[in-house]
Amino acid sequence: TTNTLKSTIRNTSIAIVTSAAFMLPMFAWGAENCDKPNNDFDGLYCLTKVYLEADKELNNSYSKLSKLLNKQQKATLKRGQLAWMRERNDQCSYNDGDGFFVNMSCATNKTANRVNFLNERVRECNAGSCRDSRLDD
């Protein structure tokens, strides 16, 4: 359901944003140059900034595409988005009992690829050639 998707997106985003909110101020002083981070924490700070921007783009692209679709197409898109989120989470994060770990580089790459995918669907729909079969990819 729509509530499940929103809840999943919200919970994932809250976990990442909350982590970022605590990390960013602590590491900002040492990460002036994301080209050459001084240490792993500076690198994580830089990756988190890029991930948060990709996540924002993902939400915007999903919203843009959703506005172009009818009710049935929206349901198909939602199924595809939930499947993509499960795949991203399975491939980019894990919980080993001691904590929850996210590979930010993996999450960022998967998210950027999904943004591109959604933007391709937006272009197709704007051109009058929405392909329903691609909405749940």
Model-derived segments and spans:
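Bacterial N-terminal signal peptides that target proteins for export
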Residues: 3-20
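N-terminal alpha-helical modules
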Residues: 28-137
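A subset of signal/propeptide-processing and intrinsically disordered low-complexity segments
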Residues: 6, 27-28
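Alpha-helical transmembrane segments and their juxtamembrane interfaces
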Residues: 20-21, 123
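N-terminal signal peptide c-region/cleavage motif recognized by signal peptidases
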Residues: 23-25
